[in-house]
């Protein structure tokens, strides 16, 4: 992944992903790719095939009506994907172009409202869960750039001991690394979920906090 740019037109927004060869020359052909519209969390995910082995950028602010930011993530399978965080409801179409190789996402206003958005901090993005009703086991997924790729989840409720789980993301040096893990069981009722890291400087929590209503097993 060499670059990401965008354009605004009267009837749509266009996000363009450019690619380069290992020696830095523009790629002639685009990689294989597939897309998934995760409307529940206002994210359009574009997954790349085995041809994409590195990235020159990790994230990009996008100043357009329909898109807020793009994250380049190393997935759990080792392959890269880009998440486009959408600012407003949209319908999407993905196409590719050769000479030079590009991937183009056209976004047009429309569709149903998004129920939720990812929780975002400087080095942490939580895609699931979203604020509201949850059940156990509680699955936590997202991506991060924490020190040494460590990810901590802490579940807190008044009158209950803290529940903690830890995992390791797939990257932290080159780009964002995906993570997913479960908290098998925990307190019911109103709970607070922290996902992030302990600061390498002073040990304080750095990450996102979610207000949840926890029920029993699903």
What positions do the PLM features span?
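Short linear recognition/processing motifs and adjacent strand/loop elements at protein termini
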Residues: 1-125, 138-141
């Amino acid at each position: 992944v060499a670059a990401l740019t965008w354009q605004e037109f009267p009837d749509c927004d266009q996000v363009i992903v450019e690619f380069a060869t290992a020696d830095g020359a523009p790629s002639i052909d685009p990689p294989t790719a597939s897309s998934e519209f995760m409307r529940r969390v206002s994210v359009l995910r574009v997954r790349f095939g085995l041809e994409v082995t590195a990235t020159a950028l990790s994230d990009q602010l996008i100043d357009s009506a329909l898109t807020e930011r793009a994250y380049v993530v190393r997935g759990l399978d080792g392959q890269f994907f880009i998440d486009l965080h959408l600012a407003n409801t949209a319908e999407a179409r993905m196409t590719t172009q050769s000479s030079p190789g590009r991937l183009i996402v056209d976004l047009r206003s429309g569709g149903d409202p998004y129920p939720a958005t990812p929780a975002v901090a400087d080095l942490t993005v939580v895609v699931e869960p979203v604020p509201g009703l949850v059940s156990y086991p509680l699955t936590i997924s997202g991506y991060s750039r924490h020190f040494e790729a460590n990810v901590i989840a802490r579940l807190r409720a008044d009158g209950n001991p803290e529940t903690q789980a830890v995992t390791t993301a797939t990257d932290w040096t080159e780009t964002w690394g995906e993570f997913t893990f479960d908290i098998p069981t925990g307190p019911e009722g109103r709970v607070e979920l922290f996902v992030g890291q302990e600061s390498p400087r002073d040990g304080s929590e750095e990450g996102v906090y979610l207000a949840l209503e926890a029920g029993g097993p699903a």
